[in-house]
């Protein structure tokens, strides 16, 4: 049932497993781009502004680039929970109903960048006609929250547009996308009895009416789990175990992405490998380049373009990575050969 709902198949299996990695922007070119985690872009390619928003976890910013590496003057500061120092943005999501962007942080906040908000003295350039700082809407730092991922989808029961947030110290949480008030989920939502209690949510990605959640060991280590739920938090499927190493980024491939078309991709921060899974959750292999498994040190977010000039083709996979020690940064692209 899930495979049919996801509309995934393995029709491209006869093709060669061959992909090319290209760096678009690195921290050597832009010193703000350090250990970038999440990346997001508008859903609608017809919007006038379709750049990628990149969460720079170390520098506390969301910097904007197009698919060719051209930077945008606008950079948005993600505030820290304490009000002082530097923010720590991880996951990010775009709201197509408002054109707003949302950011979650390691120190337990959810912040909003309001696309319609104007600075007190607006100018004519991009950086001058938009506000340059996000606003904290939820601050759960005092409760020990550590937010690592966020996804936007409609709740299956209420139909309310909802932000689902992966709290490494508390499970998956839900917030009304308009008011940011917490939503009470059913008992046992987003839990898997076969995942040890020493694992907690990390990455989260929405696809149609499903939420894909990665789980990593709270003490670190080179394993992990990936589950698929409906938006009420009911467990539907667990991806085949044994091929994860701190999974975080998730993407669903289009029909023209080479050997691994119409599959689920999972990026592993620990190993830098990207694994492909069928709609039934069966492991199909890692993406390769030159006959070897493709490795991107410190890999975080992965996402396909929306077809616009700014965010790139729908069959090009864009990624963020922080390097082996998470002290550098790369925004890049992966194409099928």
Model-inferred region functions:
Residues 1-9:
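Bacterial N-terminal signal peptides
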Residues 14-337:
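Sequence/structural signature of beta-propeller domains
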């Amino acid at each position: 049932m899930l495979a049919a709902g996801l509309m995934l198949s393995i029709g491209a299996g006869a093709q060669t497993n061959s992909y090319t990695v290209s760096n678009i922007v690195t921290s050597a070119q832009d010193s703000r781009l350090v250990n970038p985690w999440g990346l997001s872009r508008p859903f609608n390619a017809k919007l006038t502004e379709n750049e990628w928003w990149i969460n720079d976890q170390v520098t506390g910013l969301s910097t904007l680039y197009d698919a060719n590496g051209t930077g945008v003057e606008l950079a948005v500061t993600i505030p820290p929970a304490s009000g002082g120092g530097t923010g720590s943005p991880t996951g990010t999501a775009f709201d197509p109903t408002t054109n707003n962007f949302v950011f979650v942080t390691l120190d337990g906040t959810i912040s909003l960048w309001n696309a319609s908000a104007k600075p007190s003295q607006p100018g004519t350039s991009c950086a001058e006609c938009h506000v340059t700082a996000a606003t904290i809407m939820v601050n759960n730092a005092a409760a020990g929250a550590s937010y690592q991922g966020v996804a936007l989808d409609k709740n299956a029961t209420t139909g309310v547009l909802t932000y689902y947030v992966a709290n490494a110290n508390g499970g998956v949480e839900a917030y009304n996308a308009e008011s940011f008030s917490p939503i009470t989920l059913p008992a046992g939502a987003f839990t898997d009895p076969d995942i040890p209690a020493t694992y907690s949510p990390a990455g989260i990605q929405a696809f149609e009416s499903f939420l894909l959640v990665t789980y990593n060991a709270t003490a670190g280590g080179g394993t992990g789990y990936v589950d698929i739920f409906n938006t009420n938090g009911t467990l539907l499927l667990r991806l085949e175990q044994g091929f994860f190493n701190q999974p975080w980024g998730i993407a669903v491939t289009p029909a023209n992405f080479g050997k691994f078309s119409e599959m689920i991709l999972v990026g592993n921060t620990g190993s830098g490998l990207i694994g492909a899974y069928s709609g039934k959750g069966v492991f199909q292999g890692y993406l390769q380049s030159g006959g070897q498994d493709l490795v991107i040190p410190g890999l975080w977010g992965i996402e396909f373009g929306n077809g616009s000039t700014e965010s790139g083709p729908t069959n090009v996979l864009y990624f963020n990575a922080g390097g082996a020690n998470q002290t550098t940064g790369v925004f890049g692209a992966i194409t099928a050969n």
